[in-house]
A protein has these predicted regions:
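Glycine-rich portal/gate segments that line the openings of hydrophobic small-molecule binding cavities
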Residues: 25-76
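Conserved short-loop catalytic and cofactor-binding motifs
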Residues: 5, 43, 99
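Beta-strand/loop substructures that line and gate deep hydrophobic ligand-binding cavities in soluble
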Residues: 67-120, 124
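Well-ordered beta-strand positions
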Residues: 9, 45, 56-57, 82-84
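Hydrophobic ligand-binding cavity/cleft-lining segments
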Residues: 1-34
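Short, intrinsically disordered, mixed-charge
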Residues: 19-29, 61, 112-120, 124
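Charge-dense, helix-prone N-terminal extensions
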Residues: 1, 15, 28, 42, ...
Length: 124
């Protein structure tokens, strides 16, 4: 598996961005058509599919990490928020895993599309 991280500058407050990447309502605005949550299980629903993810770690206004229940235990996807100490720019780091370089390229394009939708949604 290839672990990769994508970096996106986001023009938003940390709290607004964290809400968008960590809550069912926020995630359903840009990541999936609908998101349900029960305990540590998030169910992501798209037009013709549904997938469950386990919440692995959450640090308010900093990080949220999920593991797809259908995937290998060592993989996860994560949204991490950093603030540049010099410029105060807000950065969203998306970490994910791919089987090979081709899958990584395809997933990178998908993440870019998804994060663009996120930015549009929060007015970035």
């Amino acid at each position: 598996m290839i672990k990769y991280t994508l970096e996106f500058p986001i023009k938003s407050s940390v709290s607004v961005l964290f809400n968008a990447v960590s809550t069912p309502d926020g995630l359903s605005e840009w990541f999936a058509n609908n998101v349900n949550w029960k305990g540590n299980t998030y169910t992501f629903i798209w037009d013709d599919s549904e997938e469950e993810a386990e919440l692995l770690k959450k640090v308010n206004n900093q990080l949220i990490r999920f593991r797809w229940k259908s995937q290998d235990d060592d993989t996860f996807f994560e949204f991490k928020i950093e603030v540049d100490p010099v410029t105060n720019d807000v950065i969203l780091l998306v970490t994910d895993f791919a089987e090979d370089k081709e899958e990584q390229e395809n997933e990178t394009k998908l993440w870019e599309t998804q994060v663009h939708a996120l930015m549009k949604r929060i007015g970035s």
